[in-house]
């Protein structure tokens, strides 16, 4: 029986490359000359710290970071940015967490979405991924389109497609 897994993963090497590209652009931009502005990736917690001298500049840095990550194949929805910026001394900063795995609430929404579609497939939650099995490849491809089209606030990848 054909099957595949629905996962939500961020390639940390690509994230590091995107952060490095964003740092390079910030260093060369005129509006950031003489300004303390940094973007740092913490591999251990899978967070990105964006720091600058004003909240407006932090927003600009976030826009640059999102654009560079998108060029590296990481969607902006995989960044979980807190709404409030932290003011510490003369700097402002914000922590953005990279979403890894699918939370249980989102998993339940996906399974409900698949079951409500009346396709002849079964969806099983397995840890941080969802295994979908069905008799025909067409049904599985319909499920892929359904999950991509559903507005669930997170990008998904499909792997382990077996025939």
Swiss-Prot record:
Role summary: Nucleotide-binding protein.
Annotated keywords: Nucleotide-binding
UniProt record similarity statement: Belongs to the YajQ family.
Domain of life: Bacteria
Keyword presence, Nucleotide-binding: yes
Gene Ontology CC: cytosol
Protein name per UniProt: Nucleotide-binding protein YajQ
Gene: yajQ
Segments traversing the membrane: none
Molecular function terms from GO: nucleotide binding
